[in-house]
Structure formats: structure tokens, C-alpha cells
From Swiss-Prot:
Entry's family note: Belongs to the rubredoxin family.
PROSITE patterns, sorted: RUBREDOXIN, RUBREDOXIN_LIKE
Species per Swiss-Prot/TrEMBL record: Thermoanaerobacterium thermosaccharolyticum (strain ATCC 7956 / DSM 571 / NCIMB 9385 / NCA 3814 / NCTC 13789 / WDCM 00135 / 2032) (Clostridium thermosaccharolyticum)
GO biological process, alphabetically ordered: alkane catabolic process
Protein name: Rubredoxin
Any Pfam family the entry gives: Rubredoxin
A molecular function GO annotation: electron transfer activity
Cofactor note: Binds 1 Fe(3+) ion per subunit.
Keywords assigned by UniProt, alphabetized: Electron transport, Iron, Metal-binding, Transport
Main function: Rubredoxin is a small nonheme, iron protein lacking acid-labile sulfide. Its single Fe, chelated to 4 Cys, functions as an electron acceptor and may also stabilize the conformation of the molecule.
């Protein structure tokens, strides 16, 4: 699965891990995150992430 990086703070969303801080289970692709999901480190939206 593809990882995505926040262009503001450098946080990396790894779909194999998900985002336990926002109840996103492991195996959730970046494209399948809710529209209101934000970076758990700095709070920006999905539009501030790029595929790495």
C-alpha cells in the first residue's frame, strides 16, 4: 500500500497502520479516509498530503 506524507509537518500516513488516534483501522487506504480526516500531528486536511 502507498504511504502519504504531510507536506506541512512531515507526518507519514501508513495504511498498514491506519490512524489509531482517529479510530482509522489498519488496512485503510488514504483514498478511503473520511473527508474530514486531518493530520494527527498538525491538523491540516488530506489536500496537504502527497504520495511518497
Amino acid at each position: 500500500m502507498e504511504k502519504w506524507q504531510c507536506t506541512v509537518c512531515g507526518y507519514i500516513y501508513d495504511p498498514e497502520v491506519g490512524d489509531p488516534t482517529q479510530n482509522i483501522p489498519p488496512g485503510t487506504k488514504f483514498e478511503d479516509l473520511p473527508d474530514d480526516w486531518v493530520c494527527p500531528d498538525c491538523g491540516v486536511g488530506k489536500d496537504q498530503f502527497e504520495k511518497i
